[in-house]
UniProtKB/Swiss-Prot annotation:
InterPro entries registered for this protein in UniProt: GreA/GreB_C_sf (IPR036953), TF_GreA/GreB_CS (IPR018151), Tscrpt_elong_fac_GreA (IPR006359), Tscrpt_elong_fac_GreA/B (IPR028624), Tscrpt_elong_fac_GreA/B_C (IPR001437), Tscrpt_elong_fac_GreA/B_fam (IPR023459), Tscrpt_elong_fac_GreA/B_N (IPR022691), Tscrpt_elong_fac_GreA/B_N_sf (IPR036805)
Upper taxonomic lineage: Bacteria, Pseudomonadati, Pseudomonadota, Alphaproteobacteria, Caulobacterales
Protein name: Transcription elongation factor GreA
Alphabetical keyword list: DNA-binding, Transcription, Transcription regulation
Family, per entry: Belongs to the GreA/GreB family.
PROSITE patterns: GREAB_1
Any one GO molecular function term: RNA polymerase binding
Domain of life: Bacteria
A Pfam short name: GreA_GreB
NCBIfam families found in the cross-reference section: greA, PRK00226.1-2, PRK00226.1-4, PRK00226.1-5
Biological process according to GO: DNA-templated transcription elongation; regulation of DNA-templated transcription elongation
Function per UniProt: Necessary for efficient RNA polymerase transcription elongation past template-encoded arresting sites. The arresting sites in DNA have the property of trapping a certain fraction of elongating RNA polymerases that pass through, resulting in locked ternary complexes. Cleavage of the nascent transcript by cleavage factors such as GreA or GreB allows the resumption of elongation from the new 3'terminus. GreA releases sequences of 2 to 3 nucleotides.
């Protein structure tokens, strides 16, 4: 089984969702199915079919989260240090064309949210920055062409 890097925060978020699904969502949908069964003919019972569909989604999500947790290699970013960019680093960069500065934390695939400043370890920008240090320029190949970014700062927060 291949281990997947994940921040401690990402692991906690998944664990909380798993607990919510198992303790709140699953019992609620079971109760909804039971109640819908009491309404008679199941073949034309929209409430029953909706609840069964919801149950399928919940069970699928539980299995997906359990798999991610089982494969997780949890990395406590607060215990990392160094000058090189690696998983968990928060990196400040400047676009060499537009002079626009951005700040991103490199996280696991399921944790990525660009609006929140978290980019996936497998993203083109992350792959270009891994192993680099402050002052180095990285090139990222995008559908719109090549973009160059200078690394301004590497932090461990």
């Amino acid at each position: 089984m291949e281990k997947v890097p994940m921040t401690a925060g990402g692991y906690q978020t998944l664990d909380e969702e798993l607990k919510r699904l198992k303790t709140i969502e699953r019992p609620a949908v079971i109760a909804a199915i039971s109640e819908a069964r009491q309404h008679g003919d199941l073949s034309e019972n929209a409430e029953y079919h909706a609840a069964k569909e919801r149950q399928g989604w919940i069970e699928g999500r539980i299995a997906e989260i359990e798999d991610k947790i089982a494969r997780a290699q949890v990395i406590d970013v607060s215990k990392l240090s160094g000058k090189q960019v690696k998983f968990g680093a928060t990196v400040s960069v400047v676009d060499e064309d537009t002079e626009e500065e951005s700040r991103y934390q490199i996280v696991g695939d399921h944790e990525a949210d660009v609006k929140e400043g978290r980019i996936s370890l497998s993203s083109p920008l992350s792959r270009a920055m891994i192993g680099k240090e402050v002052g180095e320029v990285v090139e990222v190949y995008t559908p719109g062409g090549v973009k160059a970014y200078e690394i301004l700062k590497v932090e461990w927060v």
